[in-house]
Amino acid sequence: ASDVYKRQVQEVGASTVKMSELKAGDSFRDFVGPLGCASEFVEEDIEELKKQKILFVAGGLGTAPVYPQVKWLHERGIDADVIIGAKTKDLVIMEKEMEEVAGNLYVTTDDGSYGRSGMVTQVIKDLVEKEGKHYDKCVAIGPMIMMKFVCLLTKELNLPTIVSMNPVMVDGTGMCGA
C-alpha cells in the first residue's frame, strides 16, 4: 500500500538509535524521501528482461534496496539470483523476504558464521566458474569496497555491472554543501 513505509536502520549514532526505537504509528517530525531515481529496470521492456539472467549482489544494508528490485522483477515473472554478503550471521538482513522472491539465494559471511564463508566475489566466481552459471547483468549495492571488487571481477568476466552511488551521497538534498 502507498501509505506504508518500511525502514531498515543500522544503529550507529543517536539519531539512528532513536529511529530504531520507533513503533508502528509513531511519527517523524520531518521526513524526506525517497530520493534518487527508480531502478533502471522499470524503463526496460519486460519481455526483453525475461530473456536475461540477472545477478544481484547485496552487501550489508545494501540488501534493503536490492529487495524491492528483485521483488519487482519476480512479480513480472523474472527470476534473479541474489547474493547477500554480511560480516557476521547477526548482520544478515531480509533473508526470509529475499527467499520468497529470488530465483536462487546465496548467503555468505566474512567470518563463516553463516552460509558460505568468505566474500561475495568468491560466490560470484564459484557460480560462474564452478557451477557454469551465465549472467547477462549484475547489480551490486553495498559498501564501496565491496562494489569495487565486484566490478573488478565482473569486468574480468565480461559481465555488465550496475552499482549504487548512494554511499557517496551525504544527505541527498545538497543542504550539506557537498
Sequence positions of predicted segments:
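Short, small-residue-biased leader/transition segments that mark boundaries at the very start
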Residues: 1-5
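Short, structured beta-strand/loop micro-motifs enriched in basic residues and often containing a Trp
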Residues: 6-14
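FNR/FR-type flavoprotein reductase catalytic core
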Residues: 17-168
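Short cysteine clusters
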Residues: 171, 176
